[in-house]
């Protein structure tokens, strides 16, 4: 539980609230929307930053033990090249966990990007499956958990 976690596309902090429930405390949030960042509970994250995840992330290489990206890979938001940045800022053997709206998985090229990163041994697949994401709206998402290899 003593690991440094980057919450990419943290929104209002829902992932941070869940992490806190499980005893994690060293996590950092980034989102493009200042309006959403303003709704994050005070002192939940060690640091909150307004960040465009479609551009290089202003973080050092190998800075984080894990990275979460939930609800951000969806229509009109963050594109597949962000996975390279996520991998760059995550340590060797660190974990990257994400969801991808099924409607953009192939259309935006996530399928090819994930396959390429796996084939190039840039990461190792631990879990990857489709699940109900917003069941009430019949929205499904792919859930991925990968271990970074460097």
Model-derived regions: residue spans:
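Conserved Class I S-adenosyl-L-methionine
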Residues: 108-129
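Conserved alpha-helix/loop element of class I SAM-dependent methyltransferases that forms part
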Residues: 1-2
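Conserved beta-strand signature within the Rossmann-like core of class I S-adenosyl-L-methionine
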Residues: 93-101
């Amino acid at each position: 539980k003593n690991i440094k976690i980057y919450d990419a596309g943290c929104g209002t902090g829902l992932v941070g609230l869940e992490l806190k429930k499980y005893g994690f405390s060293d996590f950092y949030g980034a989102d493009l929307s200042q309006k959403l960042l303003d709704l994050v509970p005070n002192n939940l994250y060690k640091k909150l930053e307004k960040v465009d995840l479609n551009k290089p992330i202003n973080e050092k290489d190998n800075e984080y033990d894990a990275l979460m990206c939930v609800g951000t890979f969806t229509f009109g938001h963050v594109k597949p090249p962000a996975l390279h940045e996520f991998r760059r800022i995550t340590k060797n053997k660190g974990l990257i966990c994400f969801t991808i709206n099924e409607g953009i998985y192939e259309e935006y090229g996530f399928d090819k990007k994930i396959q390429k990163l796996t084939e190039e041994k840039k990461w190792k697949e631990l879990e990857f499956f489709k699940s109900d994401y917003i069941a009430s709206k019949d929205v499904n998402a792919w859930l991925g958990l990968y271990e970074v290899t460097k």
